[in-house]
């Protein structure tokens, strides 16, 4: 089965073609450089960028692949920016009519869940930590069709906080990669931050940590590097600690990391030490992409 995937939930325009769960083609155009001048994504402008990019990507893929061989279309339905999601939906429906094949709506978070499964299939039950600019969740899967959210952020998502901390410290956008690059040499003085406590055992809260960094930055007692690197370390430790708590309660056969923040080196290295069977996507597949959307449909139909 050959599936075409479409991903337009935020600021990445991506189209992929997979066959039997393997990636044949994928083109992803990021809007990060465009929005760096604004310090963040502007939904209306993002929709315009998607409208321009998605047609160009389709034209390029059509020159490389025979679209008449495609059996089904998978497009991101939710969650995401309403305007950008609409672009993907309209293109999926148009292709569906032209190619006379069905277009299936896919949940973006499920895409991140399956993003690390291209090399080898998961062994269930599985636990997943999905962390991105819009989401921070712990998910327990009895099998590929029964996935339950057992913990989520009560306020900000971790990727969003990386962006806000970086903006406050004048480090640029997107915040995650900027902070990671700054702290790569590991040469900084740790500024202790208080980790939040939540009523839900596996829930997250990042607004307090964000506020601490902003307040300390206003006091001008610490360098931007010390604050940024301390935030990264404390935030990653917090994510790992929550994941460890889940592992103590649930017996699982696979531990999965997904979402844009999964590209963070510190998180990836710490995650590898938590379980004997860890699945981590490549950096290309950690960020928003259409291959993971197509993979969800493949798992549902196979």
Curated annotation (Swiss-Prot):
It is found in: Cytoplasm. It catalyses: L-threonylcarbamoyladenylate + adenosine(37) in tRNA = N(6)-L-threonylcarbamoyladenosine(37) in tRNA + AMP + H(+). Coiled coil: none annotated. Substrate binds at residues 130-134, 163, 176, 264. GO terms for molecular function: iron ion binding; N(6)-L-threonylcarbamoyladenine synthase activity. One of its GO terms (cellular component) is cytoplasm. Keywords: Acyltransferase, Cytoplasm, Iron, Metal-binding, Transferase, tRNA processing. Binds 1 Fe(2+) ion per subunit. Its EC number is 2.3.1.234. Pfam families: TsaD. Its cofactor is Fe(2+). Gene3D superfamilies: 3.30.420.40. GO terms for biological process: tRNA threonylcarbamoyladenosine modification. Fe cation binds at residues 108, 112, 288. Required for the formation of a threonylcarbamoyl group on adenosine at position 37 (t(6)A37) in tRNAs that read codons beginning with adenine. Is involved in the transfer of the threonylcarbamoyl moiety of threonylcarbamoyl-AMP (TC-AMP) to the N6 group of A37, together with TsaE and TsaB. TsaD likely plays a direct catalytic role in this reaction. Belongs to the KAE1 / TsaD family. This is tRNA N6-adenosine threonylcarbamoyltransferase. It comes from Mycoplasmopsis pulmonis (strain UAB CTIP). The lineage of its organism: Bacteria, Bacillati, Mycoplasmatota, Mycoplasmoidales, Metamycoplasmataceae.
């Amino acid at each position: 089965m050959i599936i075409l995937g479409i991903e337009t939930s935020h600021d990445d325009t991506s189209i992929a073609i997979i066959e039997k769960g393997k990636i044949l083609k994928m083109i992803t155009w990021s809007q990060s450089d465009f929005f760096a001048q604004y310090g963040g994504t502007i939904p209306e402008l993002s929709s315009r960028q998607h409208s321009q990019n998605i047609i160009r990507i389709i034209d390029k893929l059509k020159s490389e692949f025979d679209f008449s061989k495609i059996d089904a279309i998978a497009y991101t339905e939710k969650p995401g920016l309403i305007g950008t999601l609409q672009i993907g939906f309209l293109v999926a429906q148009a292709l569906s009519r032209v190619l006379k094949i069905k277009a299936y709506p896919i949940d973006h978070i499920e895409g991140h869940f399956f993003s690390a499964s291209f090399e080898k299939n998961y062994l269930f039950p599985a636990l997943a930590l999905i962390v991105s600019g819009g989401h921070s969740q712990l998910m327990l899967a009895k099998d590929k069709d029964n996935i339950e959210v057992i913990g989520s952020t009560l306020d900000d998502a971790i990727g969003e906080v990386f962006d806000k901390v970086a903006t406050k410290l004048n480090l640029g956008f997107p915040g995650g990669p900027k902070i990671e690059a700054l702290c790569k040499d590991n040469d900084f003085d740790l500024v202790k931050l208080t980790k939040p406590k939540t009523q839900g055992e596996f829930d997250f809260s990042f607004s307090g940590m964000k506020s601490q960094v902003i307040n300390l930055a206003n006091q001008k007692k610490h360098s931007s590097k010390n604050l940024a690197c301390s935030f990264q370390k404390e935030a990653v430790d917090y994510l790992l600690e929550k994941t460890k708590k889940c592992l103590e309660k649930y017996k699982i056969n696979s531990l999965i990391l997904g979402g844009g923040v999964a590209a963070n080196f510190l998180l990836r290295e710490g995650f590898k030490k938590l379980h004997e069977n860890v699945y981590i996507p490549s950096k290309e597949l950690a960020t928003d992409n259409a291959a993971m959307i197509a993979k969800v449909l493949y798992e549902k139909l196979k």
